[in-house]
Amino acid sequence: YRLSYKVHARIGPQEQMVVCPTTFNLPCPICQEYRLLRQNPEASEDEIKALRPKERTIMNVVDLNDLDSGIQLFDMSNFLFHDMLKQEITLNEDVAVHNFTDIPGGRSLRCVFTEESFNGRKFLKIHRIDFVKRKEDWDDSILEQAVDLDKAVVVLDYDSLKKLYEDGLLGTEAEAPSGKLKKRKVTAEEEEEEEEEEEEDPKPKK
């Protein structure tokens, strides 16, 4: 019902969000640059955070307020949604909650979001999740509408992704005064998301 994947945010001249190839065990030029920056004592924390891959989750869902649309895709960062969902499942002793996606005997999610802002940008963040007993089970035929999530995310090939990243660097360099590289604004996720770098060496101190 879901796929966890990694992305790099605000890449290229158009500041796109791109899928990180490491999601599918492929080499990523942006991750390579990220690791180099982490070893550079002159690199700023903002520069490093800007390249760090972020975790997202895409899911097949049915909006109970829009049943006519059938199965839809729900895509949000783990920091803003799935981390809480995972925690709520872990802390709940109800077997039905742990198996909430089951066709027979599962649960529906009642989600409450709050609107927050950071650096002038507004975004939604999950505030509360309730697991609600369904009035009736879904028919197995609903599964025929499910999207193949592995095909729902598009991964650029290595050379295309590298060019997109480098084109973005050229753009920021051209915009920056006195030949200095223009600094990117850090997003809320980059600022507040907990570090997930157990397998990487810490950044050297100056």
Residue spans of the language-model regions?
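OB-fold ssDNA-binding interfaces and closely related basic DNA-contact patches used
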Residues: Y1-N99, D159-K163, D167-G171
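Compact mixed alphabeta submodule
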Residues: L64-E198
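Intrinsically disordered, low-complexity, charge-biased tails
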Residues: E199-K203
